[in-house]
Amino acid sequence: MKKEGGGSIITLAACILGLYASFLTWSVLQERISTKPYGSNPDTGSPDFFKAPLVINIIQAFFASIVGLIYSVVSSRSNPLSIFTQNEKPVALKFFKSFVIISLTSSLSSPLGYESLKHVDYLAYLLAKSCKLIPVMLVHFVLYRTKFPLYKCMVAGSVTVGVIIFTLSHSSTKSKADISDGKTALGMAQLIGSMLLDGLTNSTQDQLFKLRGTSPSNKHTKLTGAYLMCILNAFIFINTLAYALIFKYQSEITYTVNFVHHYPQVMMNILEFAILGSVGQVFVFIILEKFDSLILITSTVTRKMISMILSVVLFGHQLNGLQWGGVGLVFGGIGYEALVKMSMNKAPTTKKNQ
């Protein structure tokens, strides 16, 4: 859904390409930090893995906020805090409350999703991530009374089913293995909670871009993608740092200091990870500002599918019949939406000519 005064298809394509490139390099570093040992423990001889996810999130949020500030200054020569200082008080207060809410939902969503992996298998986790469009539309409808046209609901359903089919047919035997610990219901509740938090985050971000003052005498400062990136990450940085200092000081802060002392390379990897993630977020917030969260989520949930199609084209790999069926549903849905929008755009022109 292109917003009024939003970006062109060229802008969207450039942002999606930038998003995919950032995710690719970012995920390689994420795997390096999370799954590869940095050495052997001198006491036990066992591999030493870095296990302080909150510290990674803190550093990531700090750098993303700084990059968002630079992005604001370069793109509009303005201060992100102007949405608080240059708007009438009710609007500024609503911005502040919304930032508090989405910084908390953003901070809680991923840990809750990862926590669910203790009780449900990885396939269930992947399928939940494939369905991200549904909770966003649900929260939009229930909380903000957003009404979606039938074609958009059909497109969301087509993309979701297509990604699910693609994920199921691509998943390895290992990922389908039952790792249930008898608390599947708890794991599913955590997964659903994570999805709803994502839905609340994305739908609230969409609403923030529409927020305007009611007084005609006051000049209203609109939220931009750069402002949102800077301020949201600053809130996440403060929330996560406070939580780590109060509740996880030994297991996160002290542990990281000791680990970096023994393995300095981990800090370089974390900094690279944070900087690349921050660059990727620039594309995320451009899409949010100029289009909407549904376009963004469609781009992210189809990323793996696009990368596999590229591997087919470039390296001669093969997809099975079910995978091609999933691809057909996804691109059929996206193509149908494009056709509907083209016909809607042509209709006013035809009436004018008559």
From Swiss-Prot:
Residue positions the entry lists as glycosylated: 202
Entry's localization field: Endoplasmic reticulum membrane
Record has Endoplasmic reticulum as a keyword: yes
GO BP annotations, alphabetical order: UDP-glucose transmembrane transport into endoplasmic reticulum
Protein's membrane topology: Multi-pass membrane protein
Membrane-spanning ranges: 6-26, 54-74, 95-112, 123-143, 148-168, 227-247, 268-288, 295-317, 321-340
GO molecular function list: UDP-galactose transmembrane transporter activity; UDP-glucose transmembrane transporter activity
One Pfam family per UniProt: UAA
Cellular component GO terms, alphabetical: endoplasmic reticulum membrane; Golgi membrane
InterPro entries given in the database record: SCL35B1-4/HUT1
UniProt keyword annotations, A-Z: Endoplasmic reticulum, Glycoprotein, Membrane, Sugar transport, Transmembrane, Transmembrane helix, Transport
Protein family per UniProt: Belongs to the nucleotide-sugar transporter family. SLC35B subfamily.
Functional summary from the UniProt entry: May be involved in specific transport of UDP-Gal from the cytosol to the Golgi lumen. Involved in the maintenance of optimal conditions for the folding of secretory pathway proteins in the endoplasmic reticulum.
Protein name: UDP-galactose transporter homolog 1
Encoding gene per record: HUT1
